[in-house]
Amino acid sequence: MQHLEEIIANATTAIDTADSLVALDEVRVQYLGKKGELTLQLQSLGKLPPEERRTAGQEINKAKGAVQQAIAARKDALQRAELEAKLAEETIDVSLPGRRIENGGLHPVTRTVERIEQFFGELGFSTESGPEIEDAFHNFDALNIADDHPARTDHDTFFFNPDLMLRTHTSGVQIRTMENGKPPFRFIAPGRVYRNDYDQTHTPMFHQVEGMLVDENVNFAQLKGILNDFLCNFFEEEVEVRFRPSFFPFTEPSAEVDVKRKDGKWLEVLGCGMVHPNVLRSVGIDPEKYSGFAFGMGVERLTMLRYGVNDLRAFFENDLRFLKQFK
């Protein structure tokens, strides 16, 4: 019988020098296969005297176990090395700057509407909405707008037919809200409105917020106080405000509200007034018992003032270079 120590030494050397799983498997076959050296040693036990077979068999099995253990250890090492090499090829350098996912941002007009809603919401005003295609009653008649008023012409209004049009203001929401409820009322109505006009300070579609408060003993001083607080809050500074007498069919008395700019000039920002008794009557409210005030403002005008934008049309041209300034 060949000396087992020599076989183990040769097998160990072959195992340690195997540089791949294929080479290692060849070593396994060489020593443990059907015709492997250790297998032949086991088969030769029959040639030994009976008294030597037991001891020789134990030695051969011990040698076989040692070779199997060495092969298993080498196989594990080769598999780890192979995996590490594969991972090295596929590795991601986490120190490299990644591709940033660009976050979107709110449109400046949306920001302004939300700011207005937040202020009046804190005063208990709800937010109401209504259809953008309006009928003549809600857009004109119920608001005390005379039949010969210029707003009823094609020059100012987009008509579908004599009784249906794109709303020219959100005042129709005020009428619908009062029709469907009972006083007191305290709400604002933001939304898109449409007028046949287009230049540096006007677009055919723009955004408006109108507000209304109807209750007993409502007066103009309350209106002035709320609007003065709103403008100071909106511009985040104490601004000088003035109320100029004006005329609107749906309010009496009526006023236009100006703020004083840093250059000393006055700029109109909104209109307001006490709700006309005829408007209250049109929705079945007794003007002898209830009074109210209303106000309306162009959102784009306020947005232009807040962010220093000179051309209203820039809000609707979808120029990312412009819009990214407000993120």
From Swiss-Prot:
Catalytic activity: tRNA(Phe) + L-phenylalanine + ATP = L-phenylalanyl-tRNA(Phe) + AMP + diphosphate + H(+)
Chief location: cytoplasm
UniProt binding sites for Mg(2+): 252
Localization annotation: Cytoplasm
GO molecular function: ATP binding; magnesium ion binding; phenylalanine-tRNA ligase activity; tRNA binding
Listed EC numbers: 6.1.1.20
A cellular component annotation (GO) from this entry: cytoplasm
Classification via CDD domains: PheRS_alpha_core
Any one GO biological process: phenylalanyl-tRNA aminoacylation
Entry keywords, A to Z: Aminoacyl-tRNA synthetase, ATP-binding, Cytoplasm, Ligase, Magnesium, Metal-binding, Nucleotide-binding, Protein biosynthesis
Cofactor entry: Mg(2+)
Co-factor remark: Binds 2 magnesium ions per tetramer.
Assigned protein family: Belongs to the class-II aminoacyl-tRNA synthetase family. Phe-tRNA synthetase alpha subunit type 1 subfamily.
Subunit structure: Tetramer of two alpha and two beta subunits.
Protein name: Phenylalanine--tRNA ligase alpha subunit
